[in-house]
Swiss-Prot record:
Belongs to the amino acid/polyamine transporter 2 family. Amino acid/auxin permease (AAAP) (TC 2.A.18.2) subfamily. InterPro entries: AA_transpt_TM. It is a multi-pass membrane protein. Residues 62-63, 137-159, 204-227, 291-309, 380, 435-451 are extracellular. The keyword Ligase does not apply. This is Lysine histidine transporter-like 3. It comes from Arabidopsis thaliana.
Length: 451
């Protein structure tokens, strides 16, 4: 590890560190604390994966149809679990070296400069776009609560943009937490909330039963053609599996010894997390589509009309979960920016620097969310364009470079299949996502029912 450069050899405040022989890694939010264990891994990963994407899965199913929808849903779960395992295995693949950040693993595979150029922009875009979507979803949930509480007429006075501002206020406070382990309590509550609102969504749908005159065929919606909607749905599915962008950062919080490497508790936590993911995703996607067919809305909780109290509770759970999810994705961004500010620009690592960086980021994501409050369109575009590479095929490319499996062996073939499928999603899904986003921008942000 490298300490603070001599050109900025300031003495840190006593409230930041006790030892004046300061190491940068001991201050940055990803590596400041390494006392986590397998269940920290489990709930951090649940919080990271089961996010806003689960609420859009029934809508994605309606755009894909039963056959393709089920295939894509299952295939995505299997492929992403495999690439998740790859990243955990590669965290300490070289003795005495831990790849605590995604871009460090990329540098090991592609070279010091090229690795940064490939991974850092994608990871920043993934984490920033996730935070933007969570801002939008939090605002939508707050608006739904307001609508159910005061009625449609009164709710028309406020748009979803106003509720995004309210949700953002919580992130200005939570962003003050120092590192990954300091948000463990928030992440645990968020994980429980994600399971709770997912359960409410599919149980309420199942209890309601199949809607009258339900249809499962393809239909044109929101001025988006059926083929473009189909492509966009692939991006929505990809968005639902975004945990890979923080997996190494989560593993970095787990202690490691030669006798008990960090990959053991991390993989144990990942298995638990993916079982929970399956419990959340499959019932919500399948039961939601079965109940409402192609009349399901972009957010399944917006489709459910009652009982009113249950829908309010579900949206409260969504809001609490998103408070934690936002921080899980924002923490690596804070780590990158703080590292650059201290290493390259020689800023002193103080609370003022930390708060300035974090509040600026929260304000920026809030501003973009207010400008583009379109849930499904954002899922489609971001999911295909930037989530697919970091989740579906970059781990496989790195594995082929570093592990060098024998050509045409099982490992080699599996990785190339994942790469081909991931590249296809990256190319075609943003086409549908961009079309949906352009059409969404033409729609007014007016009544409660429409937004």
């Amino acid at each position: 590890m490298k300490g603070i450069p001599s050109s900025s050899n300031q003495i840190l405040n006593q409230d930041l560190v006790e030892d004046q022989s300061f190491e940068l890694e001991d201050w940055l939010p990803i590596t400041a604390s390494r006392n986590a264990n397998w269940y920290y891994s489990a709930f951090h990963n649940v919080t990271a994966i089961v996010g806003a994407g689960v609420l859009g899965l029934p809508y994605a199913m309606s755009e894909l149809g039963w056959g393709p929808g089920v295939v894509v849903l299952i295939l995505s779960w299997v492929i992403t679990l495999y690439t998740f395992w790859q990243m955990i295995e590669m965290h300490e693949m070289f003795e005495g070296k831990r790849f605590d950040r995604y871009h460090e693993l990329g540098q090991a595979a592609f070279g010091k400069k090229l690795g940064l150029y490939i991974v850092v922009p994608l990871q920043l875009l993934v984490e920033t776009s996730a935070c933007i979507v969570y801002m939008v979803t939090g605002g939508e949930s707050l608006k739904k609560i307001h609508q159910l509480s005061v009625g449609d007429y009164e709710c028309r006075k406020l748009k979803v943009r106003h509720f995004i501002l309210i949700f953002a206020s919580s992130q200005f406070v939570l962003s003050l937490l120092k590192n990954f382990n300091s948000i463990s309590g928030v992440s645990l509550v968020a994980a429980v909330m994600s399971m709770s609102y997912s359960t409410i969504a599919w149980v309420a749908s199942l209890t309601k039963g199949v809607a009258n005159n339900v249809e499962y065929g393809y239909k044109r919606r929101n001025n988006t053609s059926v083929p473009l909607a189909f492509l966009g749905a692939l991006g929505e599915m990809a968005f639902a599996y975004a945990g890979h962008n923080v997996v190494l950062e989560i593993q970095a919080t787990i202690p490691s010894t030669p006798e008990n490497p960090s990959k053991r508790p991390m993989w144990k936590g990942a298995i638990v997390a993916y079982i929970i993911v399956a419990f959340c995703y499959f019932p919500v996607a399948l039961v939601g589509f079965w109940t409402f067919g192609n009349n399901v809305e972009e957010n399944i909780l917006k489709t459910l009309r009652g009982p009113k109290g249950l829908i309010i509770v579900a949206n409260i759970f969504v809001i609490i979960h998103l408070m934690g999810s936002y921080q899980v994705y924002a923490m690596p961004v804070f780590d990158m920016i703080e590292s650059v500010m201290i290493k390259k620009w020689h800023f002193s690592p103080t609370r003022v620097l930390r708060f300035t960086i974090r509040w600026t980021f929260v304000a920026a994501t809030m501003g973009i969310a207010v400008a583009l409050p379109h849930f499904s369109a954002l899922l489609s575009f971001f999911g295909g364009f930037i989530f697919a590479p970091t989740t579906y095929f970059i781990p496989c490319i790195i594995w082929l470079i570093l592990k060098k499996p024998k050509r045409f062996s099982l490992s080699w073939c599996i990785n190339w299949i994942c790469i081909i499928l991931g590249v296809l999603v990256m190319i075609i899904a943003p086409i549908g996502g961009l079309a949906k986003l352009m059409n969404a921008l033409k729609q007014p942000d007016s009544s409660c029912k429409s937004t």
